[in-house]
């Protein structure tokens, strides 16, 4: 049974991030139903991310001090219930409340989830985080497809399925968590026995280099969250597809991550996380620029090119996912929960603060022009990656 504990945490991650992916996938429906502007749609994303972004580091800090792994179950339950309620509300204001609560659930889940997976990984933390990331990538990949299929066929009430899944996995986690923690303690002891010299060294926090990593996280987060929010709208408004095809495009974007997040973890273990982070940004930067130019191409090649670029961006995001988490936890070895709250939670949410700004620019000019403003963030991230140092050389 013990060997399945990491997969149980990963399953919880999948359900939690499935809930986070519902709102962007259904933005075209909400825009139509409530007559929203793109700026208002952006504020829905902001509601889903702002409070969560503020809570992530705080909850991570509390996690380091108090160690409450059952928050993994509580966070998943809150996200799932809030997502289900989106199918039953009748106003834009109610949607804002549900979106906010779903974001809070995410902020509760991620620090403790990443912290326990770090311990369960033992000496192969990149692989462990790659496994954990599969859950998140699967959730973001299939959540939009599932939500779109429900909302555009049987109706928005079908979102209650997310609540049912959340209740089941949260109950199982709550009951098994004492055993999972005991198993993690056994792994900690085994690692200390195998590496007594490393275990004897006092843990240190390298805030300077974590700050540089945080700049990279911001550059990635801004791009990731805006793409996540507006890809369905980009497909329907700029490329002339149906809403279902817009949801499918979002699924394609995240599907590539299911495999590549795991590969990124393995590559990080082999070559070091810094090299993989730099490679990610080198791929992401030109791909983001090219995506904004797709509507200018002929209809014959427009859609194939759009999907190809989307896959490249998905690859770039996915391979850096685990290395960013592991590097952050290594730089802040004394504060793994806090580091996880920044690298995993905030990296998925804080970029949503920019979504209303991009939405406003899209209303004023065009969506491709608004998305072009994301490219400078990646340039800053790439430059910052050149300033990172291997944690082994800092000891």
Spans of model-derived segments:
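Helix-to-loop junctions at the C-terminal end of transmembrane segments
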Residues: 55-67, 261-272, 362-363
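Residue-level signature of mid-helix packing/kink "hotspots" within the transmembrane helices
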Residues: 21, 49-57, 140-141, 254-262, ...
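C-terminal transmembrane helical hairpin of 12-TM major facilitator-type secondary transporters
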Residues: 273-324
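Extracytoplasmic gate region of multi-pass secondary transporters
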Residues: 23-24, 208-254
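Conserved MFS/SLC helix-loop-helix module at the cytosolic interface between two early adjacent transmembrane helices
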Residues: 54-90
